Curated annotation (Swiss-Prot):
GO terms for molecular function: metalloendopeptidase activity; zinc ion binding. Its EC number is 3.4.24.-. It comes from Lactobacillus acidophilus (strain ATCC 700396 / NCK56 / N2 / NCFM). This is Protease HtpX homolog. InterPro entries: HtpX_protease (IPR050083), Pept_M48_protease_HtpX (IPR022919), Peptidase_M48 (IPR001915).
Length: 298
């Protein structure tokens, strides 16, 4: 089953990459139409910029994601207990020892990232170290190292990168429209017909709203089922479902994180922003109670 899941994750990576390229192309086309009346100019700029960003980040994606989340790398002497738990879980999972980071945030949480098991890293918050006992930490780190073993980190890293790119493009567009849109409209009103106005409105809506939402939904599609599998794999490693159950309950009852990066939310073991209501539709994690019920039946 493990090798089948790894193969599925690699196929999903290719499919999600295609989906993100489509979204990027549409966002770029809208951007080009708004700024120069040339969709192709925007497409070329968006795709070329994204490719350069991906190539730069791909050299060491863990470093950039850790930086976005204000995580600080540690060595064994800095926190021997945490180091040895990670070391033990890595040995049981049969993956290389990942780099270890601590996030200076009082809310308990953790995540893993990297492009493959040989270039992986795990991060835990200061809050999780203060709040949880060894059994709970083993459950959490077993979950994160299961993501490493199953190549989930590759999918998640790609999702973070591409959502970040699309959000960056949308941010540039919104600032440009805010500062310069009024002047352009005054100059162009005489020469603009009704169809051009409609197309510009559609382009604005897609670049500023639909593009980022579509990217977030694509990222969400990467995450939900993988959390259930990582929970089950953690129990396989620790032989103790109660440790992870207790950890999930403590995380669910905690305050939202202050140091987490929003584009990285899907990486964490539990949503660091604790979305509720309508925003739960866009959550990258299954409901905690559903996860706990599955663990209780193992």
């Amino acid at each position: 089953m493990l090798y089948q899941q790894i193969a599925r994750n690699k196929r999903k990576t290719a499919l999600i990459m295609v989906l993100f390229v489509v979204i990027l192309t549409l966002v770029g086309a809208g951007l080009g139409y708004l700024f120069s009346n040339s969709p192709w100019t925007g497409i070329i700029i968006a795709l070329a910029g994204s490719l350069i960003y991906l190539l730069i980040m791909w050299q060491n994606p863990a470093n950039m994601i850790m930086s976005l989340n204000h995580a600080q790398e540690i060595q064994e002497a800095d926190n021997p207990e945490l180091w040895h738990i990670v070391e033990d879980m890595a040995m049981v999972a049969r993956v290389p020892m990942p780099r270890v980071f601590i996030i200076p945030d009082p809310s308990p949480n953790a995540f893993a990232t990297g492009r493959d098991p040989e270039h992986s890293a795990v991060a835990v918050t200061q809050g999780i170290l203060e709040l949880m006992n060894r059994e709970e930490l083993e459950g959490v780190l077993g979950h994160e190292l299961s993501h490493v073993r199953n190549y989930d980190i590759l999918l998640s890293t790609i999702g973070v990168v591409l959502v970040g790119v699309i959000s960056f493009i949308s941010g540039i567009a919104s600032r440009y429209i805010w500062f310069f849109g009024g002047n352009r409209r005054d100059d162009e009103d005489r020469d603009t017909n009704a169809f051009e106005i409609i197309f510009k409105v559609i382009a604005i809506v897609f670049v500023l709203i639909l593009g980022p939402i579509s990217a977030s939904l694509a990222q969400m599609a990467l995450s939900r089922n993988r959390e259930y599998l990582a929970d089950a794999s953690s129990v396989e490693l620790t032989r103790n479902p109660q440790g992870l159950i207790s950890a999930l309950r403590k995380i669910e009852g905690s305050q939202p994180m202050r140091q987490a990066d929003r584009s990285s939310a899907g990486l964490y073991i539990e949503n660091p922003f604790h979305n509720h209501g309508l925003s739960h539709l866009f959550d990258t994690h299954p409901p905690t109670e559903d996860r706990i019920k599955r663990l209780e039946h193992m």
